[in-house]
């Protein structure tokens, strides 16, 4: 594989684009508005500038990486790509439309991957005529730094597709794990209910935000407490994953806590909104 298209220029999409470009891949970064594309490219530029400042890369390397990334609002730019990674909003209807469009645009051998954190790869693949070439590639934030990629098979994903994506993940410095399709996959099925339980402990008045996080950092050796981590991920994303886990399994242990819903309804989404369980506006 030589050329990759990333659909969605938000934090995850931009990070994925940076990770590929840093390892020599030609990358197309696509979003629906020029302002979104420009914001994504600026995000990558700032990330690379920080690496230059820290002495981790040279200025010339930064320039080389940036020249490998082209931004666009034209989905047809994915036509000659070997791999397309969708990192759009976590809604099945939107993802299926994107994959249906890509199926018509891309060459027959192109692999179509989704960065979904919890949705069904099999259902996404049903929107295409190439379900054998549809797969999940779940990156973690920040994508240029985090080593893990969950590689998720849909019911029709071929071994050839899986092997190609695994090899490509290793080529960009990641350490992939193979995951059978299931709600939340591995990490989020364990992690998000833990965050939800921490919300419940807070709501019941058992401990404060700070003490809940301190307890898990000192008692379980977690680098970040569950409520701080929820703010980092985005409380809206945490809620969306809990909703998928609950609706898919019907298990009450995955029911999102009322307080989590209230925060999301209030627009208190964590770091990205300036307020979540902590105040980031200062």
From Swiss-Prot:
- Pathway per the UniProt entry: Lipid metabolism; butanoate metabolism
GO terms of molecular function: 3-hydroxybutyryl-CoA dehydrogenase activity; NAD+ binding
Alphabetical UniProt keywords? Fatty acid metabolism, Lipid metabolism, NADP, Oxidoreductase
List residue numbers at the site (Important for catalytic activity).
138
EC class of the enzyme, as a word: oxidoreductase
- UniProt-listed Pfam families: 3HCDH (PF00725), 3HCDH_N (PF02737)
What Enzyme Commission number(s) apply to this enzyme?
Answer: 1.1.1.157
Please give the InterPro entries that the UniProt record associates with this protein: 3-OHacyl-CoA_DH, 3-OHacyl-CoA_DH_CS, 3-OHacyl-CoA_DH_NAD-bd, 3HC_DH_C, 6-PGluconate_DH-like_C_sf, 6PGD_dom2, NAD(P)-bd_dom_sf
Catalysed reaction, written as an equation: (3S)-3-hydroxybutanoyl-CoA + NADP(+) = acetoacetyl-CoA + NADPH + H(+)
Q: One GO BP annotation here?
A: butyrate metabolic process
- Family indicated by similarity: Belongs to the 3-hydroxyacyl-CoA dehydrogenase family.
Q: Which PANTHER family match?
A: 3-HYDROXYACYL-COA DEHYDROGENASE FAMILY PROTEIN, 3-HYDROXYBUTYRYL-COA DEHYDROGENASE
* Designated name of the protein: 3-hydroxybutyryl-CoA dehydrogenase
- Identify the species of origin: Clostridium acetobutylicum (strain ATCC 824 / DSM 792 / JCM 1419 / IAM 19013 / LMG 5710 / NBRC 13948 / NRRL B-527 / VKM B-1787 / 2291 / W)
